[in-house]
Amino acid sequence: RAKTALAAWAHNEAVPLVSVGAAGGKRRAEAMQIADLAEVTHDPLLAQLRYRLRKHHGAARQGRMGTLCVFSREAVAPPDASCGLDTSDGSLNCHGFGSVVAVTAAFGFAAAGCLMDTLVNTNLQKVGGAFKTPKNHATI
């Protein structure tokens, strides 16, 4: 819910935002991709974000949504049964799947780089403590 609130605020205030999807159970950092939230697949965390933005915040149902996302279409690797982990809570956290630092770090670095690129290539004006794009400039 916090991610949804942040994304809704960023969209309403025309502040660039890069969101990061689920890394739990992923092993291949090189499989990471960056796309608009509307184009993301194979990521339940970002699917939930997309659903909540559309249902509760009036986000576009067709075309781009304006939130860039770092994600992976790699299938989640289930935990090794010999580890004896309880994975029954059904939540979207890494519990039971674990995470690989190479994947989480790559996601974070990609998000930071994407946001820096967006800020450098967007004519932003600081207004009232928040960055806003000029009225004649398309948002991401």
Predicted regions and their residues:
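ADP-ribose/adenylate-binding Rossmann-like module
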Residues: 1-35
